[in-house]
Amino acid sequence: YMKTESKPGMAPKLLDIVESLPSKVGIYYIHNEKGDLIYIGKSKNIKNRINQHFTSKVSKSIKIQKQVYTVTYEETGSELIALLKESEEIKINKPIYNRAQRKTLFNWALYSEKNKDGYIALKVAKTDGRKKEITSFASLQEGKNALFRITEKYNLCQKVNGIYDTKKSCFQYDISQCFGACIGKENPEEYNKRVHDFIQNNSFENNNMVLIDKGRTNGERSAILIENGVYKGYCFYDLNYQISNIEVMKNILIPMQNNRDTRTIIQGYLRKN
């Protein structure tokens, strides 16, 4: 058992709250004296995260330190469930200090379009509701980093995807990771097949998926259900109790809302795992 380091001057009330929290993955709820929710967050380590809120000198944290009365929490075991739950709880409860997160945060998206030479180019642009997006991002930099990894993973061309500005062949071609779309050497049909593979692997549309992850204890697993491309919810199950089919899972499912944010959170998770 490790006592949390407290900075000099942390009020005993705050210290007591920190000491009562687990060093586990989950979502936490900060309440004021009236019982109103003033902030919701998620963390890989709830205890550490609350300790940061209570010792930080930024103005939002100082307001939280003055107003906090209790902190409740829910362990999720899975980081993905914590992210999804945080997103939904903020939308429903609209806590005063979560203002920024109430709005949809993903303002950049990945789009595909055929270029003049017949190759399908992928590009990151400001979100445009009229166009069909493949996935979305919180920042332009996150989008560019993802596009870079996608281009590498699927042997696509940096020049076609607008990452490498050149009149000649792209850098990936010089090290044999691109098959020459940049200089018209690879036939567009072959190239576009790999782009379609990427889109297929990253699109939920009509897909049925069960994402299995860690549970809250060693003997437990968590599962997230996506049915026909729609995020349905999550559940926890005992390792000794096999979930043999989707119907069994649906009986213990905690239903959740499906929206653009949940789709983006799940896609981001799939990209990284």
Model regions and ranges:
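Acidic, glycine-enriched active-site microenvironments
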Residues: 1-273
